[in-house]
């Protein structure tokens, strides 16, 4: 009943339940239907009475009363007159709130064009009329006439006439023979007279006939807009306005300031200009003013309306009194301060507070300390309610007084209220979901919030003055979600990689590490202890120390839960830690019977979580934290200057390196090496010296020393302890303190040749200090840029992935990805086990030896399976992936696999897209901003030899080797690899060996660890012959294409190929070497081509004409330096480049087909390369390659699809087009992982896959069939599949398309939801497009729902949606049943009523 009474007083309709929102162009009738009256005067309020002027911009008669239930003149007051319209002032008596809802309108004396449809590119009006924007503007702004009806004259339709031409035409043909108009009326006429169906049909015919690409594109664009208008029911002439709507006055308020001035919204100024000009125009028309004056006024009106809708889009920006541009309606929506991002996506909330945080080591993991004052303020409503319930107060006023006086009973009640009521803590910047967590508050004195030390990692908080915000979840549902989902105890694992995030750090690690150290010759060595009691006794009496080697008995339980014990060699410190381990058969003592570095502690917590569950883990973490702090305090580890050790050999190493650099300097002066080579060698030498000194220093720090007096082991070096345990500091920092600072970089990124030889302990010289300032300043500038860039990357990622939600359990996909271990420089960086853990197997995984099934198809791969897989040495596994998931909207749980933050299969409704975006974006701030500029050597080859990293047997993949005249094995293949297999035949290491390397091993040899496998010259790239014969030169003309340079010091001459194209005489030359037999015939290569080797500029000739060469001999060398120093984009810019799918600057050229390489006729400054396919049905493919680029293919080489013709970073689009989706996915995943791996950041592959899935959602139509699309359209992949299914059923022709890769920004703007796209970027463009097409937003994603103010369709909201769907389906069934049983209409009506009520 109550609700009904309240509804009487509520002027709004009940909150409608709706499923979608549509946007379209407003027709004049529509605008009038919204309006409550016309605004005729520009006045706002009367400056004396402060009452709104009648018919003005704030008119109470049109917009509603100023005070609740009171008319303007004060005749009718209070509720009883509700709904009456006062006869004196014409104001309706109602709530003043209607001034936020009621709109007005302005009738324009002349039509004006809507600037969005005119100027937002591509101009919709322009495309529709097939005129250029310039021409339309000439007509609109009264410069030219346009012919609308040519009649029988020689004029053409849409022809523009200047004033003079118009006069001449009138004289020539007479005024009534043709119609030419000017201004918006002209455009209105043209648009109103368009027959869209006919135009669409004509365009389709033209499209079918045209052959030129450009024309086709133009026609397609026009056809698209015409079809949009036809489908949406919009009329073209609505893009010209005759009526301007006026938004409600409370959305553009006029606020009195003190001192009698007013602050007003800019919109009021803009509306005033429109009204003034409109009224003036009306008056001029009534007065029959001269045409030129009226025209000028019309133009000014058009400009005023333009400024109102989008100020600054055309012409000068209209500024206010203080020279600041006025904010137009468009600006209200745009950007960070616009309606979408400021008020709809993020709002300020009440019941929140913020304060400084301090550490709370005595808290439990699920608690936080809340200052009493703060809690009192935050929980006020709850306290009032409780005071009332307990009878301490009868009114709110009384309760308020009690609370203000802070009476003792208030504190008791506060305690009750707070008990079991979680609060949310948030630290800005909230980069991932662990930046907001729920805690149970405990009341504390003081004014700072206490935070548990273990959650600092998740919040990225420290206690140097950080602040945190507290929010109170009010409703029961909110409290429930906070407790079940957001409690800190429920967030033990990191969503990005599944490793524990509640891990001790800094002091705690140091304490635990100290506790676990073993020392030699301590008192009591070799004693045996039966239990902890004895041990404690011995420790207290100093019979043993924490580090003594002892034997101790560790008690745990077996699988049945019966106590068992076992004796271990350990130390008292480790026994103390072992005492805290949960008693479980799967948690052995060995897990903490080792040096507890941060990594090992993390592994231990992970192990406990996997085997003992969440509750045990939380208790264990709390205990281990207490233990760590206690022993860090007891140990008292600190360091002074003497703890930084400078190695004795430093001076010697520095002297040796200086001698080397002097030698290089000499070689350069003698002309033996170039400037670049000298630079590379010097930088290399100093780099090696720094490393050597660091090694020596670390060896000194690690060394175990004994005290000569007591004979006991000396205390370990504390700097080393801190670094080695992972508590603080790194080898790099220790090197700078005690070794040598080493090489520094210039601001441009190049390395300065002179290093800093001193360290901080010795102190820097003035010059050294100056050199080091570059880096320091650049570091600061980088950090500032990085934060903004990283935040923007996260925002784009969230936007593209926000609608990837787990929406079903299994999509039944039969395709997936192949996972293999990632190998980098022979080292396995990511093992196959790490990569497949927590993913669903696509095919059964079989044991390679026994053939038994390890994991069945469709089961998730767990830790225990990974152990078996790793032992069995399986090298590739097919798994399900979000990329290949076939779910219509969202992703299915099977394809996604494990929810990393819980360690269980993912739940339905989990917003995996947002989690992926946060996991990738959050570490963004740790990535570097810099582009590496590396010298030739440093980038091309890091070393000049390869050593075996494992023992085993050698196998050569793609073996292609020959023995040269020195009897060495030489690699002739371009993609050959050396594999090292262990005894079981499992690949332990894979090394790529480059063309021209010398091999020291062959197939089947056994190698020891550290044995040399191959070596090569790092500074040159060889050109070798494959056949034995005699050398002959072609086109190597002295002075033109070859020059001899003599070395002054040695007198040795070398012949170098010079740029022959620089002289006119040499333009046709093709410098090459050919190998002939004795008879002088050119020899053939194994692949069929001639033995002719083309030489590029700067090649150094290694043989003389007529020399006899054997296969594998080098005939020329190309200095690596000429493979100009490349910039390697690294860090954040590289990640952004990959996600935006940009083409890299010097991108690789990839072969599109298998075939043979042939050299075609050269182009001006490009080489033409043709690939002749092995298969005759395919056309040959041509590539043009810039001539000076280093290029390693020879005529006649056989090339495979996907091989690189020109090295560089490949463009992702090429990979997609040539090798397909799977290759693209693995390329993007590996490249992005590479960047993060360098920084030591772990991110699970599936997150990157989810984002790549969102980038691959569109296909480009190639064959339209009967789909109604136009070739070149971008359509959702799933949408096309649905349409095709329907067409096949109807027996029509389906369409087909190729997948397209869109960058994340593009993909976000192309989401089906226009609300989401508009709130992302380019708001006006998105809304214009959506309005023309009459787009429908079905509110599928998260952002749209947040904006319209509903629960998001993920998590708990996802469940509600599902239940609602089931309920509606049931209701329909019931209605159908009833309809069948009772034919009576009344029953049906009643039922419909019932159902509606139920739905509400």
From Swiss-Prot:
Its EC number is 2.7.7.6. Belongs to the RNA polymerase beta' chain family. The lineage of its organism: Bacteria, Pseudomonadati, Pseudomonadota, Alphaproteobacteria, Hyphomicrobiales. One of its GO terms (cellular component) is DNA-directed RNA polymerase complex. Keywords: DNA-directed RNA polymerase, Magnesium, Metal-binding, Nucleotidyltransferase, Transcription, Transferase, Zinc. This is DNA-directed RNA polymerase subunit beta'. Mg(2+) binds at residues 462, 464, 466. GO terms for molecular function: DNA binding; DNA-directed RNA polymerase activity; magnesium ion binding; zinc ion binding. The RNAP catalytic core consists of 2 alpha, 1 beta, 1 beta' and 1 omega subunit. When a sigma factor is associated with the core the holoenzyme is formed, which can initiate transcription. Gene3D superfamilies: 1.10.132.30, 1.10.150.390, 1.10.1790.20, 1.10.40.90, 2.40.40.20, 2.40.50.100, RNA polymerase II, clamp domain, RNA polymerase Rpb1, domain 3. DNA-dependent RNA polymerase catalyzes the transcription of DNA into RNA using the four ribonucleoside triphosphates as substrates. Zn(2+) 1 binds at residues 71, 73, 86, 89. Binds 1 Mg(2+) ion per subunit. HAMAP family: RNApol_bact_RpoC (MF_01322). Zn(2+) 2 binds at residues 811, 885, 892, 895. It comes from the Bacteria. SMART domains: RPOLA_N. It catalyses: RNA(n) + a ribonucleoside 5'-triphosphate = RNA(n+1) + diphosphate. It is an enzyme of class 2 (transferase). Its cofactor is Mg(2+); Zn(2+). One of its GO terms (biological process) is DNA-templated transcription. PANTHER family: DNA-DIRECTED RNA POLYMERASE (PTHR19376), DNA-DIRECTED RNA POLYMERASE SUBUNIT BETA (PTHR19376:SF54). It holds the Pfam family RNA_pol_Rpb1_4.
């Amino acid at each position: 009943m109550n609700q009904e009474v309240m509804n009487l007083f509520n002027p709004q309709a009940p909150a409608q339940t709706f499923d979608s929102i549509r946007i379209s162009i407003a027709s004049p009738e529509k605008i009038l239907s919204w309006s409550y009256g016309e605004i005729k005067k520009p006045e706002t309020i009367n400056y004396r009475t402060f009452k709104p002027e009648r018919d003005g911009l704030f008119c109470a008669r049109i917009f509603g009363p100023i005070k609740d239930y009171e008319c303007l003149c004060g005749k009718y007051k209070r509720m009883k007159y509700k709904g009456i319209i006062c006869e004196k002032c014409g104001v309706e008596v109602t709530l003043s709130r209607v001034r936020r809802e009621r709109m007005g309108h302005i009738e324009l004396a002349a039509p004006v064009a809507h600037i969005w449809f005119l100027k937002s590119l591509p101009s919709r009006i322009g495309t529709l009329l097939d005129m250029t924007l310039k021409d339309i503007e000439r007509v609109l702004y009264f410069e030219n006439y346009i012919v609308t009806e040519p009649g029988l004259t020689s004029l053409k339709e849409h022809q523009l006439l200047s004033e003079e031409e118009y006069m001449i035409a009138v004289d020539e043909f007479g005024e009534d023979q043709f119609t030419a108009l000017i201004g918006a009326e002209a455009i209105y006429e043209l648009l109103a007279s368009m027959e869209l169906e006919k135009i669409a049909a004509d365009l389709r015919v033209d499209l079918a006939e045209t052959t030129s690409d450009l024309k086709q594109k133009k026609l397609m664009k026009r056809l698209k807009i015409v079809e949009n208008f036809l489908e949406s029911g919009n009329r073209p002439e609505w893009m010209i306005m005759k009526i301007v709507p006026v938004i409600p006055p409370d959305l553009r308020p006029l606020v009195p300031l003190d001192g009698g001035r007013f602050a007003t919204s800019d919109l009021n100024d803009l509306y005033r200009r429109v009204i003034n000009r409109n009224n003036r125009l009306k008056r001029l028309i009534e007065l029959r003013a001269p045409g030129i004056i009226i025209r000028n006024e019309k133009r000014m009106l058009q400009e005023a309306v333009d400024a109102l809708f989008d100020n600054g889009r055309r012409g000068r920006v209209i500024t206010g009194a203080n020279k600041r541009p006025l904010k137009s309606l468009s600006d209200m929506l745009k950007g960070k301060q616009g309606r979408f991002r400021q008020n709809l996506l993020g709002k300020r909330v009440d019941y929140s507070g913020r304060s400084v945080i301090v550490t709370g080591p005595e808290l439990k993991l699920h608690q936080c300390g809340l200052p009493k004052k703060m809690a009192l303020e935050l929980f006020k409503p709850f306290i009032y309610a409780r005071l009332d319930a307990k009878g301490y107060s009868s009114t709110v006023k009384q309760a308020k007084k009690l609370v203000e006086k802070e009476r003792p009973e208030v504190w008791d009640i506060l305690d009750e209220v707070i008990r079991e009521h979680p609060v949310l803590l948030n630290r800005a910047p909230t980069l991932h979901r662990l930046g907001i967590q729920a805690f149970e508050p405990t009341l504390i004195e003081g004014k700072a919030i206490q935070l548990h030390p273990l959650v600092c990692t998740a919040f990225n908080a420290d206690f140097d003055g950080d602040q945190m915000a507290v929010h109170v979840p009010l409703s029961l549902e909110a409290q429930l979600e906070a407790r079940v989902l957001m409690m800190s105890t429920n967030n033990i694992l990191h969503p990005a990689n599944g490793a524990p995030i509640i891990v001790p750090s800094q002091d705690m690690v140091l304490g635990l590490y100290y506790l676990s150290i073993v020392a030699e010759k301590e008192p009591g060595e070799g004693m045996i202890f039966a239990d902890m009691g004895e041990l404690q006794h011995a420790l207290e009496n100093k019979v043993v120390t924490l580090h003594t080697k002892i034997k101790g008995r560790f008690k745990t339980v077996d699988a049945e839960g019966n106590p068992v014990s076992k004796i271990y060699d350990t130390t008292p410190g480790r026994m103390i830690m072992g005492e805290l381990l949960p008693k479980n058969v799967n948690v052995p003592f060995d897990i903490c019977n080792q040096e507890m570095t941060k990594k090992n502690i993390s592994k231990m917590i992970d192990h406990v979580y996997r085997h003992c569950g969440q509750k045990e883990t939380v208790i264990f973490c709390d205990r281990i934290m207490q233990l760590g702090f206690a022993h860090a305090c007891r140990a008292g580890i600190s360091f002074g200057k003497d703890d930084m050790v400078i190695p004795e050999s430093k001076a010697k190493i520095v002297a040796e390196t200086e001698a080397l650099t002097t030698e290089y300097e000499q070689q350069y002066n003698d002309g033996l090496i170039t400037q670049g080579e000298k630079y590379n060698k010097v930088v290399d030498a100093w780099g090696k010296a720094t490393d050597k000194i660091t090694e020596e220093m670390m060896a000194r720090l690690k060394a175990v020393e004994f005290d000569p007096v007591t004979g006991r082991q000396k205390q370990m070096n504390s700097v080393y302890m801190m670094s080695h345990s992972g508590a603080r500091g790194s080898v790099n920092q220790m090197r700078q303190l005690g070794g040598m600072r080493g090489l520094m970089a210039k601001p441009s990124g190049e390395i300065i040749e002179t290093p800093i030889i001193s360290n901080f302990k010795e102190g820097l010289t003035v010059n050294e200090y100056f050199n080091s300032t570059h880096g320091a300043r650049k570091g600061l500038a980088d950090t500032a840029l990085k934060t903004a860039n990283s935040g923007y990357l996260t925002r784009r990622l969230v936007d593209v992935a926000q609608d990837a939600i787990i929406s079903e359990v299994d999509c039944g996909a039969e395709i997936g990805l192949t996972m293999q271990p990632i190998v980098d420089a022979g080292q396995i960086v990511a093992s196959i086990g790490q990569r497949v853990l927590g993913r669903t197997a696509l095919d059964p995984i079989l044991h390679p030896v026994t053939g038994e099934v390890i994991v069945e198809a469709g089961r998730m791969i767990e830790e225990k399976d990974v152990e078996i897989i790793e032992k069995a040495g399986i090298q590739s596994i097919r798994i399900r992936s979000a990329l290949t998931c076939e779910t219509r909207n969202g992703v299915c749980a099977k394809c996604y696999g494990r929810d990393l933050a819980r360690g269980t299969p993912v739940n339905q409704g989990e917003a995996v897209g947002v989690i992926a975006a946060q996991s990738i974006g959050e570490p963004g701030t740790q990535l570097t901003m810099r582009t590496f500029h590396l010298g030739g050597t440093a980038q091309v080859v890091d070393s000049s030899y390869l050593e075996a990293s494992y023992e085993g047997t050698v196998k050569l993949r793609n073996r292609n080797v020959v023995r040269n005249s020195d009897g060495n094995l030489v690699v002739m293949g371009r993609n050959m690899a050396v594999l090292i297999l262990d005894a079981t035949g499992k690949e332990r290491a894979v090394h790529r060996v480059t063309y021209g390397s010398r091999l020291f091993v062959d197939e089947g040899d056994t190698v020891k660890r550290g044995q040399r496998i191959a070596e090569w010259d790092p500074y040159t790239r060889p050109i070798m012959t494959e056949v034995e014969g005699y050398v002959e030169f072609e086109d190597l003309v002295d002075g033109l294409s070859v020059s001899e340079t003599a070395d002054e010091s040695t007198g040795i001459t070398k012949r170098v190929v010079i740029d022959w194209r620089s002289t006119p005489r040499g333009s046709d030359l093709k410098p090459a070497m050919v190998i002939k037999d004795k008879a002088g015939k050119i020899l053939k290569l194994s692949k069929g081509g001639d033995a002719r080797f083309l030489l590029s500029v700067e090649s150094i000739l290694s043989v003389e004409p007529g020399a006899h060469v054997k296969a594998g001999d080098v005939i020329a060398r190309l200095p690596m330096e000429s493979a100009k120093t490349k910039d390697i984009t690294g860090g954040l810019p590289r990640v952004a480049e990959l996600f935006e799918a940009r083409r890299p600057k010097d991108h690789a050229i990839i072969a599109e087909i298998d075939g043979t390489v042939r050299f075609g006729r050269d182009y001006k400054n490009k080489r033409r390369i043709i690939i002749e396919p092995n298969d005759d049905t395919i056309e040959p493919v041509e590539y043009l390659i810039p001539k000076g680029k280093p290029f390693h293919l020879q005529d006649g080489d056989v090339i495979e699809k996907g091989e690189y013709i020109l090295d560089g970073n490949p463009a992702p689009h090429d990979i997609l087009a040539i090798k397909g989706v799977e290759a693209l996915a693995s390329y993007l995943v590996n490249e992005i992982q590479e960047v993060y791996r360098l920084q030591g950041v772990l991110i699970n592959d599936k997150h990157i896959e989810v984002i790549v899935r969102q980038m691959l959602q569109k296909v480009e139509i190639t064959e339209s069939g009967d789909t109604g699309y136009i070739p070149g359209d971008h359509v959702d992949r799933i949408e096309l599949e649905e349409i095709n299914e329907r067409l096949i059923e109807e027996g029509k022709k389906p369409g087909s398309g190729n997948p397209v890769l869109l960058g994340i920004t593009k993909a976000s703007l192309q989401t089906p939801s226009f609300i989401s796209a508009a709130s992302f970027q380019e708001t006006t463009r998105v809304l214009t497009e959506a309005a023309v097409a009459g787009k429908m937003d079905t509110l599928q994603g998260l952002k749209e729902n947040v904006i319209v103010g509903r629960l998001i369709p993920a998590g708990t909201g996802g469940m509600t949606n599902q239940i609602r769907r089931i309920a509606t389906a049931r209701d329909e069934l019931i209605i159908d049943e009833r309809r069948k049983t009772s034919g009576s209409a009344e029953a049906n009506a009643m039922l419909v009523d019932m159902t509606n009520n139920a739905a509400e």
